[in-house]
Amino acid sequence: MVTSAQALKKYGDPTLENNMVVWDVPTELEVGVIPKKLYCNKDMVAPLSAAFKNLIDTGYVKELKTFDGCFNIRKKRGLTSMSLHSWGIAIDVNAAWNQLNMTPTLSAGFVKCFTDANFEWGGTWERKDGMHFQLKSI
C-alpha cells in the first residue's frame, strides 16, 4: 500500500501541485460521469486510461454512477496522515453507495477493471473505503 510518507518523498509538498496535470480525457475513454478534463497527478493518466478502457470493454461502465473526486489536499477522515488525494493519486467513485466503514457495493468485475490497471481498492481494507481506488505503486 502506498503511504502518504512515500507520496511526500516522491512528489513533495502537495500544496505546490508540482506533478499535477489537466488530463483531457480522450473521446474514446469518456465515461459518462467522469469530467472531460480531470485534474490529477501525471502518474495517474496511464492507469486511469487503462481502468476506463477496462470498464468500457467489459461493460462494467454501466455501474459507474458518480465521480466523487481525485485531487483534494486534506487529511484522511478521522486520522492525522494526509490522504493520497492530496497528491492526486487516488480517485473516489459511487461514494453514496460505498461510505467509509460500510460494506462496499461495487461488483468484483468493476473492481477488477481498476486493480488490473495498477490500482489498489479500499474496499478490502480493515477500515473499508469502498469508493476509493489509489495507485498500487508509485
Task: Label each region the model flagged.
Residues 18-19, 41, 54, 72, ...:
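Detector for Asparagine
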Residues 49-89:
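Active-site-adjacent loop/helix surface patches within enzyme catalytic domains
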